[in-house]
Design a protein with these regions (language model features):
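Histidine-dependent nucleotide/RNA phosphoesterase domain, centered on the 2H-phosphoesterase fold
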Residues: 1-139
Length: 139
């Protein structure tokens, strides 16, 4: 499981190098997060079930600012944890949405000590993630 702060899509090796250089300039102290609301991407055809993390807004803003020269800020984007990818739902969207609305959980807090530049490759068996660079939070 990981927290997505920004989705870049398909980018070249040159762009990856530039992103690495930009993210290396971010200075962040360890910070606390807790689970927020659950939701889906595309209510019409659910593809992703996610949860928002409260407390990640500052680092998301820093990432957006660091990358703004080459990647536009998505106004509607919200940092999130992908809980599930959905391949196919046959007329079950309303049941999933109702379940998520009624979902209850203990709002545990966690400390984030780093952020990672990740590569994801979608395969028929699911996504494959590779850590390209880890950026440590500093006190």
């Amino acid at each position: 499981i990981h927290l997505t702060l920004k989705f870049l899509g398909e980018i070249t090796d040159e762009q990856i190098h530039w992103v690495d250089q930009a993210l290396s300039q971010i200075t962040v102290e360890p910070f606390n997060v807790k689970l927020g609301v659950a939701g889906v991407f595309s209510k019409r055809h659910i593809r992703i079930i996610w949860m928002h993390l409260i407390g990640a807004e500052a680092i998301q803003k820093q990432v957006d600012n660091a990358l703004s020269e080459r990647f536009k800020t998505e106004e509607r984007f919200m940092s999130h944890i992908t809980m599930a990818r959905v391949k196919y739902l046959k007329q079950e969207n309303s049941r999933v949405l109702t379940y998520l609305d009624e979902l209850s959980y203990e709002p545990h807090e966690a400390t984030i000590n780093s952020f990672i530049l990740k590569k994801s490759v979608l395969t028929p068996k699911g996504p494959i993630y590779e850590n390209l660079k880890i950026y440590s939070a500093k006190r």
